[in-house]
Amino acid sequence: MVQEIGKGENGFTNSLYSDDFYLFQEKLLRNYEMSEGINLKPQFVPQTIYWLYVGGKPVGYGKLRHYLNQHLLQHGGHIGYAIRPMDRGKGYAKILLNKLIQESINKQIKQILLTCYESNEASRKVIESNGGELRDKKEGVCFYWINNI
């Protein structure tokens, strides 16, 4: 699934992408460390990866950043997600984002920022269907906020 998503698109960086299985394992360990705030590079914040399984197979994954720094306020926000190409258009992104929002509530994140390209109509619909309120547009990027209060 991670291979099918590719290196990234529409602003989502597939940090797990690799042709090398051992490198993939290392990336999984690195993502665990990131979720715990261990060995973070200065520009990074803790983030947790969540997987969406349907019928016993992974169809997508999302990243929940535990808080924002100045960079993430302009690029990326709290949440990023991707669905494998063959499973797009089936409502899985809406389900995954809803689950990520629930996890953000568990982490006591009161307001969630999501960004997507203005041209990414599918992602805009997913965000809006999960309560995203468009508050700004800058250089072709939409800034949505969701209140968890």
Sequence positions of predicted segments:
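Conserved acetyl-CoA-binding loop-helix of GNAT-fold acetyltransferases
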Residues: 80-83, 89-102, 124-129
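Conserved GNAT acetyl-CoA-binding A-motif
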Residues: 104-115
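Conserved G/P- and acidic residue-centered "switch" motifs that form tight phosphate/ATP-binding loops
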Residues: 91, 108, 120
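GNAT-family acyltransferases
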Residues: 1-78, 139-149
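Conserved beta-strand-loop-alpha-helix junction that forms the acyl-donor binding cleft
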Residues: 114-122
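Short coil/turn motifs at secondary-structure junctions
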Residues: 67-69, 86, 119
